[in-house]
């Protein structure tokens, strides 16, 4: 098809005019670094705001209801002074595209029927709607006519839009009403520090609230500003609360500056997760006589209270920092600080929350309770991994004013729920600037590369390498978190195959040792003076990051139910001797007439994460063991220990991963790994690997252990060779009693399944819950 030259010229000129106005996100965290050029590779009619034809009814559209993210919700239309809904009859993805563009998103990802975001109120304005997808407004699509419908609100339609915004999109507020929602992108609002005390602090906790309009940042008049507005703004920027400030200093500053005010005011209830959910307040009309928009007022100021870990002066020195009380809720399985599966403490035991009716408001209550801001996303469908144990809460419905999730309206019955429906959150956290102090170079994609850090040397900021000596997966996890790239999938001690920045080839950090919870690499322990004998160009630390990770969890109940003793002849233990599965005294045992006493049990290891568990080494590096005639893909997959009650090791064992495979899987999940015929090894997410009690090395040699009370402990993936989303649940403990002839195992539980107080009771409780007799 030929394109008229004039049309092309007009489009090109329009593009040249528009490009300079684009601004990158004020929000620092990936993935908000939007790549604007890809927007313009799409057909122009898809992404530009159009003038509505004069013969088309003027409407406004918003996304409402029980939203889990800002870019989704029930479709509501403002027509003839009243908000109403749209019926799902004949609705299509083409209509969803029109809706999403009308509220400022590039396109629709999907649409939902049957009031999945809750039933609306008021009239059902549109039914049997048909769009081609090219319309500039929903009002231009064909339908039964305004208000002509046979639908009820349980048929209200919803949409899920792409997270990508239309560059330069402006909210159309030509319809004057006082219940209109704002439509402000998170990158279009900021807290600008004004007083010198706040200008160079991270995070920014106090300053003017400014909205970007076109190319200019504008202040908001404080005439109609309320503490509820401040509460919402602080929550957006990662702060759990707000406080009062000194208005005198700001009044003096305002009197000396020429200010440009936004023409609208805000009217938040204080329960909103995001400023875009607030209503517009009265318009700020300019006084034509005094030429003033905010007469007798000044710019709105917010002063936010950070939690202790984000306080500008450090956790211990910021006395006024927000301090959460004894936690009754926690997050597990998230890659970033402030995200994870929601778990609640009840009767001393941690349990999960079912995602029925889970939305942004309830998620925000959890986030604030933990010292973060409001929720960016209410995560459903166990997308942050499956929990273990009970499901404590269901159908949580918070109003947004609660101090804790346990204060919300909820159902304590969990019928119909399982761990595939575990709820999670992604919370707003303050911008700390950590992301700008580390980078990856030389990798094949943005998720991998040699680690380069920015540090101060001789009064200047310089980039340099990190020594790869003793660099491991825990340190790599911190780097990936700092960059907002998810979990670490690999840690490299050699990066000679990656060409880093030639101006950053000097080692400036060595001896890095992290616990795994740090916000940045600089918070990890490291050498004061750099010591890296092998150098950093070839042996610089590197990482590969991934958005998902596996999560191995041992079934404690299986261990408790299958434990028993066996006196096994040495003649049957020669292979076990070769693989060091017996205690040291076994070398002195008569190989023909002697025997060893073995504590045997079965292990059922589940992968509850979001990706497959694969050995660190490829099959080319697996080790062949001729005696057992099999390959070991991981020389140490688990540790088995028998400890005294004070924690001293009295007997030990270990299990090499001679065969990591899918024994069984949940539901319709297909097995992917099988050891037969030198097959690939691993554990698929949603599957488990069963190590039966009757296979070699599935034991602890307790021949030399005297009778008494002990702690039995199993540690999976003990050397952190393979990354996981949660290492805290890799430990399982049991109380055990051995009388010289029989063994009892009781109170078996996975690490972190109970409160610390309950854990201590388990370790000192003398009661017996089962009686496993020895088999001799």
Curated annotation (Swiss-Prot):
<feature type="domain" description="SRCR 1">
    <location>
        <begin position="61"/>
        <end position="162"/>
    </location>
</feature>
<dbReference type="GO" id="GO:0070828">
    <property type="term" value="P:heterochromatin organization"/>
</dbReference>
<keyword id="KW-1015">Disulfide bond</keyword>
<dbReference type="InterPro" id="IPR001695">
    <property type="entry name" value="Lysyl_oxidase"/>
</dbReference>
<keyword id="KW-0158">Chromosome</keyword>
<dbReference type="GO" id="GO:0046688">
    <property type="term" value="P:response to copper ion"/>
</dbReference>
<keyword id="KW-0156">Chromatin regulator</keyword>
<dbReference type="GO" id="GO:0036211">
    <property type="term" value="P:protein modification process"/>
</dbReference>
<dbReference type="GO" id="GO:0016020">
    <property type="term" value="C:membrane"/>
</dbReference>
<feature type="disulfide bond">
    <location>
        <begin position="734"/>
        <end position="748"/>
    </location>
</feature>
<feature type="binding site">
    <location>
        <position position="724"/>
    </location>
    <ligand>
        <name>Ca(2+)</name>
    </ligand>
</feature>
<feature type="disulfide bond">
    <location>
        <begin position="659"/>
        <end position="675"/>
    </location>
</feature>
<dbReference type="GO" id="GO:0010718">
    <property type="term" value="P:positive regulation of epithelial to mesenchymal transition"/>
</dbReference>
<feature type="disulfide bond">
    <location>
        <begin position="367"/>
        <end position="427"/>
    </location>
</feature>
<feature type="glycosylation site" description="N-linked (GlcNAc...) asparagine">
    <location>
        <position position="291"/>
    </location>
</feature>
<dbReference type="GO" id="GO:0030199">
    <property type="term" value="P:collagen fibril organization"/>
</dbReference>
<feature type="disulfide bond">
    <location>
        <begin position="87"/>
        <end position="151"/>
    </location>
</feature>
<dbReference type="GO" id="GO:0005507">
    <property type="term" value="F:copper ion binding"/>
</dbReference>
<feature type="binding site">
    <location>
        <position position="628"/>
    </location>
    <ligand>
        <name>Cu cation</name>
    </ligand>
</feature>
<keyword id="KW-0678">Repressor</keyword>
<dbReference type="GO" id="GO:0000785">
    <property type="term" value="C:chromatin"/>
</dbReference>
<protein>
    <recommendedName>
        <fullName>Lysyl oxidase homolog 2</fullName>
        <ecNumber>1.4.3.13</ecNumber>
    </recommendedName>
</protein>
<dbReference type="GO" id="GO:0043542">
    <property type="term" value="P:endothelial cell migration"/>
</dbReference>
<feature type="disulfide bond">
    <location>
        <begin position="467"/>
        <end position="532"/>
    </location>
</feature>
<feature type="domain" description="SRCR 2">
    <location>
        <begin position="191"/>
        <end position="305"/>
    </location>
</feature>
<feature type="disulfide bond">
    <location>
        <begin position="268"/>
        <end position="278"/>
    </location>
</feature>
<feature type="binding site">
    <location>
        <position position="632"/>
    </location>
    <ligand>
        <name>Cu cation</name>
    </ligand>
</feature>
<dbReference type="GO" id="GO:0045892">
    <property type="term" value="P:negative regulation of DNA-templated transcription"/>
</dbReference>
<keyword id="KW-0964">Secreted</keyword>
<dbReference type="Pfam" id="PF01186">
    <property type="entry name" value="Lysyl_oxidase"/>
</dbReference>
<keyword id="KW-0805">Transcription regulation</keyword>
<feature type="binding site">
    <location>
        <position position="730"/>
    </location>
    <ligand>
        <name>Ca(2+)</name>
    </ligand>
</feature>
<dbReference type="InterPro" id="IPR001190">
    <property type="entry name" value="SRCR"/>
</dbReference>
<feature type="cross-link" description="Lysine tyrosylquinone (Lys-Tyr)">
    <location>
        <begin position="655"/>
        <end position="691"/>
    </location>
</feature>
<dbReference type="GO" id="GO:0070492">
    <property type="term" value="F:oligosaccharide binding"/>
</dbReference>
<dbReference type="GO" id="GO:0005615">
    <property type="term" value="C:extracellular space"/>
</dbReference>
<dbReference type="GO" id="GO:1902455">
    <property type="term" value="P:negative regulation of stem cell population maintenance"/>
</dbReference>
<feature type="binding site">
    <location>
        <position position="630"/>
    </location>
    <ligand>
        <name>Cu cation</name>
    </ligand>
</feature>
<dbReference type="GO" id="GO:0001666">
    <property type="term" value="P:response to hypoxia"/>
</dbReference>
<comment type="function">
    <text>Mediates the post-translational oxidative deamination of lysine residues on target proteins leading to the formation of deaminated lysine (allysine). Acts as a transcription corepressor and specifically mediates deamination of trimethylated 'Lys-4' of histone H3 (H3K4me3), a specific tag for epigenetic transcriptional activation. Shows no activity against histone H3 when it is trimethylated on 'Lys-9' (H3K9me3) or 'Lys-27' (H3K27me3) or when 'Lys-4' is monomethylated (H3K4me1) or dimethylated (H3K4me2).</text>
</comment>
<keyword id="KW-0801">TPQ</keyword>
<dbReference type="GO" id="GO:0032332">
    <property type="term" value="P:positive regulation of chondrocyte differentiation"/>
</dbReference>
